[in-house]
């Protein structure tokens, strides 16, 4: 089988299976396809995978060819469905594989990487493998895998969060500065108290007496001494 013929048929099949639903009559093939999740190989079909947005999930496929003729793996795709109503939520990007030829009675392995980026909810992942056989492209669905998808927890030390915090802090500081320059200075000038001027000690005036005073020969003021006391002193001097 020519490779150009395979790729042409593969491209035509992708164009005609929009929504990944095959058209025409269904055919039974003896090709077994299974996969494991390399990050969590212990998960089975009955388990529920737990993924976070931003994760990269690697599906490792095993294709067993039990047909009597050679087959060729040429592509892989898939879809996430709502497990309750079986509605398709999103389709995976179709990826090219190989092509990888698988002789009768043999098996091959290949990987598919899936970037998780969905609204947090419960989903069922159903991969599809494109097989070329006898100049025909066959779309073979694989088993479903239930998965719960949540948003990744944001660490306080995440560089993206730190950068955002710095931007917000600088912006906030800039707004405060502009507001102070426009309104703050004028406001504080209007409400600030006026400081009283200090008078120096050299300019301070000395106390002034309010009434006449008499200074005795002894050198002190006699105005405050009782009159009777002064008379007694005079009498003693006469004697």
Curated annotation (Swiss-Prot):
Feature: compositional bias, Polar residues: 211-221
UniProt topology in membrane: Single-pass type I membrane protein
Residues annotated as transmembrane: 162-182
Lumenal membrane side: 20-161
Function: Is probably involved in a pathway contributing to genomic integrity.
Keyword Endoplasmic reticulum belongs to the record: yes
Originating organism: Candida albicans (strain SC5314 / ATCC MYA-2876)
Main location: endoplasmic reticulum
Region (Disordered): 202-222
Location of this chain's protein in the cell: Endoplasmic reticulum membrane
One GO location term (cellular component): endoplasmic reticulum membrane
One Pfam family matching this protein: TRAP_alpha
Alphabetized UniProt keyword annotations: Endoplasmic reticulum, Membrane, Signal, Transmembrane, Transmembrane helix
Domain of life: Eukaryota
Leader sequence residues: 1-19
InterPro entries in the cross-refs: TRAP_alpha
Protein name per its UniProtKB record: Increased recombination centers protein 22-2
Cytoplasmic domain ranges by topology: 183-239
Family indicated by similarity: Belongs to the IRC22 family.
């Amino acid at each position: 089988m020519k490779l150009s013929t395979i790729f042409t048929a593969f491209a035509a099949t992708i164009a005609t299976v929009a929504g990944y639903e095959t058209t025409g009559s269904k055919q039974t093939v003896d090709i077994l396809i299974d996969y494991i999740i390399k990050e969590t190989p212990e998960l089975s079909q009955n388990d529920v995978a737990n993924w976070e947005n931003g994760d990269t999930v690697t599906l490792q496929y095993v294709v067993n060819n039990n047909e009597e003729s050679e087959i060729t793996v040429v592509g892989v795709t898939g879809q996430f469905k709502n497990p309750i109503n079986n509605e398709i939520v999103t389709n995976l990007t179709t990826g090219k594989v190989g092509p990888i030829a698988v002789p009768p009675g043999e098996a091959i392995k290949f990987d598919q990487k899936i970037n998780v980026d969905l609204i947090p909810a419960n989903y069922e992942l159903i991969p599809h493998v494109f097989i070329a056989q006898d100049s025909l492209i066959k779309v073979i669905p694989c088993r479903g895998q239930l998965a719960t998808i949540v948003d990744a927890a944001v660490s306080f030390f995440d560089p993206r969060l730190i950068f955002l915090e710095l931007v917000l802090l600088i912006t906030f500081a800039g707004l405060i500065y502009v507001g102070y320059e426009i309104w703050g200075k004028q406001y504080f000038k209007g409400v600030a108290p006026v400081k009283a001027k200090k008078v120096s000690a050299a300019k301070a005036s000395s106390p002034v007496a309010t009434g006449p005073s008499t200074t005795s020969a002894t050198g002190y003021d006699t105005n405050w001494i009782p009159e009777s006391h002064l008379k007694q002193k005079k009498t003693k001097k006469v004697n």
